[in-house]
Regions:
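Protein kinase-like catalytic core scaffold
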Residues: 42-44, 155, 178, 216
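Acidic, Mg2+-coordinating active-site environments of NTP-dependent enzymes
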Residues: 87, 166-172, 176-280
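Flexible beta-alpha connector loops of hexameric P-loop NTPases
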Residues: 129-136, 188-194
Length: 280
């Protein structure tokens, strides 16, 4: 409370000049409530790894919540519209039917939008157009490596029922969650999954993590997948080759629901009764 505004500004400037987001600034001064130049004061050290104990449990004065301040500075909340929520755009793709192809197409579209995009799928681990690892990377370890990479600005991660049961998802929430199918129950006996109905509890994981401002993209041609729609915290987009499916018609009629389907050989995005041909 006693720090002079000019002293605080000089400390911030010193950290910026060195290129640090968080720094400890050691100063020599007779009175911290006065500008340094009026008392011959100076900065003697810029510390990249400052200790917090002296602020949390000071010998003199009130404790300061520096840990909370650091976290809020590095990962600002979007609740007050002052910055991003500390998340990158993330698309999760779950299933077995052409999921690698879907993941690669989505990653390519994100790349074209200007994001440095990471992709973990059955075809390998990719950073933008570069193949980093040419093995099956549709698993937790590869996805975690991707999310730890500071250069990645958007990510697409493929999963299936086996990886979800074995490891879970590598992320807590996603902007878009795609579920293509619920195949493969015959391979999951080791996880005590024997019946097709049990697949709902497994594959709903991908829908459960969709953010409120995000969307679940579900295959309307498979009733068990389409039935996951009420579980999404965000919007729901249904897709199928046949746009006349009853589930799509019902979804479009309810709250202007969105759906993607093929009509007269063209891909159509429908919002309620309105239809827009994509690619035109």
């Amino acid at each position: 409370d006693d720090v002079h505004p000019e002293v605080a500004y000089i400390a911030q400037l010193a950290a910026k000049v060195v290129g640090l987001d968080i720094a400890g600034i050691d100063m020599v001064a007779r009175d911290i409530s006065k500008p340094l130049h009026t008392q011959g004061g100076a900065i003697v050290e810029v510390n990249a790894g400052p200790g917090l104990l002296m602020h949390l449990k000071p010998a003199v004065g009130a404790p300061r919540p520096v840990g909370q301040a650091i976290a809020e500075h590095l990962f600002p909340s979007d609740a007050d519209d002052e910055g991003p929520a500390g998340r990158i755009p993330l698309v999760g793709v779950a299933g077995t039917r052409n999921t690698a192809t879907i993941s690669r197409v989505v990653a390519w579209l994100l790349h074209l939008s200007g994001h440095h995009t990471g992709l973990a799928c059955r075809d390998g681990l990719f950073l933008d157009r570069r193949l980093v690892e040419a093995t099956d990377c549709a698993h937790w370890e590869a996805a975690h490596r991707l999310l730890m990479n500071k250069m990645v600005q958007a990510a697409v991660i493929e999963s299936d029922a086996r990886t979800i049961l074995r490891d879970g998802l590598a992320y807590d929430r996603c902007q878009v969650g795609v579920v293509t199918d619920m195949d493969g129950v015959e391979t999951l006996a080791e996880f005590d999954v024997h019946e097709q109905d049990q697949m709902t509890k497994v594959m709903r994981t991908q829908v459960d993590v969709v953010l409120a401002e995000g969307a679940a993209v579900l295959n309307a041609a498979i009733p068990q997948v389409a039935d996951l729609a009420p579980l999404s915290d965000g919007d729901v987009v249904l897709y199928a080759q046949d746009g006349t499916l009853p589930v799509i018609a019902e979804h479009r009629a309810k709250d202007n629901g969105r759906a993607v389907f093929v009509k007269n050989g063209r891909v159509v995005l429908a919002t309620g009764s309105a239809e827009h041909v994509l690619g035109t």
